Amino acid sequence: MVDKTSVAAEIAEPERRKVFRKVFRQLGAATVITMFGKAVLDSRPARAASVLRPPGALPEPEFNAACIRCGLCVEACPLDILHLASWSDPAPTGTPYFVGRTDPCRMCPDIPCARACPTGALSPLLTDIKKADMGVAVLVGHETCLNYKGLTCSICVRVCPIIGEAISLKQIKNERGVLQIPTVDSSKCTGCGTCEKHCVLSEAAIRLLPRELGLGVEGAQSVGRW
């Protein structure tokens, strides 16, 4: 007499093996995708030098920890200056940023972006926009700035919203004679990006950088090297 249970088991066995193989393949693919995604995320720079945070932003590590990627600050910006970083942007995904060369911060007196932040990633303690610290302007193009070539350009000085304080022309002497060189007072500069936006060169001679880069703040690698 044929054991029907045994026959049924033999018939079902290949089907079970097929199901298991499919499950294992899917798990394997998911694992590879997860590992690849993590590797890509880990290899990306946390924030490119051209990417600036909204006014009131905490220092970068604290900001990334406090920001919940809600986008309320972006919605609150009346001039659509702020953007939420996507996968392809040079900043942690979902965090707000702006690029001074294309769209500088207009320094709204009531700082609506900071007021909209629910977590304090953009500090509510910032009440005077002139005290904002989004970055610092740095004259990086000593070879390209028109003033270093003996001409006189004052665009960056004239468009600065902290006029007469953050950027001024200072005289220096070299083989070309007396030059008028744009000079930034880092204690007054808010990092809005207006000077970089309006630089007449195709590659701006004055650039906005995160303050720790622009002022050369010492990092962990400097320990024991002096």
UniProtKB/Swiss-Prot annotation:
**What positions does the entry give for [4Fe-4S] cluster 3 binding?**
C145, C153, C156, C160
Residues involved in [4Fe-4S] cluster 4 binding? C189, C192, C195, C199
Q: Which PROSITE patterns has this protein been placed in? A: 4FE4S_FER_1 (PS00198), 4FE4S_FER_2 (PS51379)
Keywords (alphabetical) are: 4Fe-4S, Electron transport, Iron, Iron-sulfur, Metal-binding, Repeat, Transport
Which pathway, per its entry? One-carbon metabolism; methylamine degradation
Please tell me where [4Fe-4S] cluster 2 binds in this chain.
Answer: C105, C108, C113, C117
Q: Which residues bind [4Fe-4S] cluster 1?
A: C67, C70, C73, C77
Which InterPro entries does this one have?
4Fe4S_Fe-S-bd, 4Fe4S_Fe_S_CS, MauM_NapG
4Fe-4S ferredoxin-type domain segment(s): 59-87, 95-127, 136-172, 180-211
Molecular function per GO: 4 iron, 4 sulfur cluster binding; metal ion binding
Role noted for this protein: Involved in electron transfer.
- Name of the featured protein: Methylamine utilization ferredoxin-type protein MauM
Identify the taxonomic lineage of the organism of origin: Bacteria, Pseudomonadati, Pseudomonadota, Betaproteobacteria, Nitrosomonadales
